[in-house]
Amino acid sequence: MKAGFIAVVGRPNVGKSTLINKLVSEKVAIVSDKAGTTRDNIKGILNFKDNQYIFIDTPGIHKPQHLLGEYMTNIAVKILKDVDIILFLIDASKPIGTGDMFVMDRINENSKKPRILLVNKVDLISDEQKEEKIKEIEEKLGKFDKIIFASGMYSFGISQLLEALDPYLEDGVKYYPDDMYTDMSTYRIITEIVREKILLKTRDEIPHSVAIEIINVERKEGKKDKFDINIYVERDSQKGIIIGKDGKMLKEIGVEARKEIEELLGEKIYLGLWVKVKDDWRKKKPFLKELGYVEE
């Protein structure tokens, strides 16, 4: 038995969460097309051929604009020192930009661990462009212990990735039970489900300005469990967008979130959603701490 912790890093919105969900074959991390979707280090655990791979989905490393962004970048950078392997993800269909190089600089500053580069969406480029991409990688990002190419939906590349990770796993250890695919609590998963539905249904500044908190859980024998959840935004205008005309948007969010939560729990529930305004909450340390977004 071998096991190891693998930090999955990259610029925001490069596809880290999609990769981990695919690897684990479970929905561990929420996914949207909005940058900054992942706010915490989330573990996805894969047991395969007597090996245990613990993939850590990190927030996209970027230059922070507020305390929440600072927290997200700090925990992503900190994990670089603690893992066994760094898995850097880039998009083959896009030029390597300043965001990718910013991530590479943080890796160089904070870790000497083995580095594997996963180049996603290689099915969107030609063989000639693939050769050019390899040269671009060497020029802008430097050397890696291994470079793996994968298709956009990972129809190929996964087995090659696991094979590349194997030599760096630690012998004789196992960190989690075979039936465990994440270390996230059920309540945390529930709040992430609600946030995902908002991300998928709203636009502009809303996705970055939303926080979710379970404020009450009622369990009575013979009755459905009831979850009351606050949705925090920073402006009255944002509150109006989430509620929608005659409450239509909030109802749609609630219906979709409740359905997925019921699938998670295996039982019917009541779900109450309440939209609250907390001015500039992303800049306020006490509130961020209340939500679990400030390191002790």
Swiss-Prot record:
Residues 36-40 are annotated as: G2. Residues 120-123 are annotated as: G4. Transmembrane segments: none annotated. GTP binds at residues 10-17, 57-61, 120-123. GO terms for biological process: ribosomal small subunit assembly. Residues 150-152 are annotated as: G5. Residues 202-279 form the KH type-2 domain. Residues 57-60 are annotated as: G3. Residues 2-171 form the Era-type G domain. It is a peripheral membrane protein. GO terms for molecular function: GTP binding; GTPase activity; ribosomal small subunit binding; rRNA binding; small ribosomal subunit rRNA binding. SUPFAM superfamilies: P-loop containing nucleoside triphosphate hydrolases, Prokaryotic type KH domain (KH-domain type II). The keyword Membrane applies. It is found in: Cytoplasm; Cell inner membrane. Residues 10-17 are annotated as: G1. NCBIfam families: era (TIGR00436), PRK00089.1 (NF000908), small_GTP (TIGR00231). An essential GTPase that binds both GDP and GTP, with rapid nucleotide exchange. Plays a role in 16S rRNA processing and 30S ribosomal subunit biogenesis and possibly also in cell cycle regulation and energy metabolism. Belongs to the TRAFAC class TrmE-Era-EngA-EngB-Septin-like GTPase superfamily. Era GTPase family. This is GTPase Era.
